[in-house]
Amino acid sequence: MNLQTATSQEVEDYLKTCTGIILPTGSLEQHGPVGLIGTDAICVETIALRAAEQASTLVAPVLNYAPAQFNLGFAGTISLSAQTFSQIFTEITTSLMRSGFDRVYVLNGHGANLAPLRSAVHDLYLKHDEAAPRVKIRNWWDFPEVNVLRQQLYGEWEGLHGTPSEVAITQYAVRSVTRENADPPRALSKDEIRETAGDYHGPASEHRKNFSDGRVGSFSELAEHEHGGQFVTAAASALIEEFRAFVKE
């Protein structure tokens, strides 16, 4: 069930049997020459709604405005400060708590969301202690089944941004953008992979200079529509299993 298309009475009825909700979090930022600006949001929303269809879970609207300052050198990117993002998440979660939800499962699609999300959760626990809803944060690509598939299909060319796996999901869910005879991006060193984990990048001008076409070690053009369906199926199945266990804790 989708929260924004549900009635208040339907939510009350849902809460009689389940007090958990899935909150997808994404971003609005460039994703390379063939990646859609809303890629992160599209991925988590598609996976979450598939899970909801199969398991009758409730899904909140995707939080798609997020910290992405490092991509502001590319047209169309919209960025919030980490502080603003954290505050919005806190107020969403507090509102859900007042409705009676005590489990909020965050399905995340954007690495730079992780630090402010975790900070906000600590503050919720500090303020409300045991009354605070329990929060679980999971990147969709970290499900073991999904990660195995990513490596099988793309290996090292999965990279870090504009990944073929996320592009494949948008091809499956929305549309494909083609680019003939595309060259692979510059491969990342182990140091770069370690230092930029969680989208920990420098300022926008520096980032555009280092990654001129927006791809960060990812050969986006390896994505295929069929792959997207495989990723959605695998991720939704893993999400259902983990969500069910979470709400029983």
Question: Model regions: which residues?
Answer:
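Extended, histidine- and acidic-residue-enriched regions that form the cofactor-binding/catalytic faces
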Residues: 1-103, 109-249
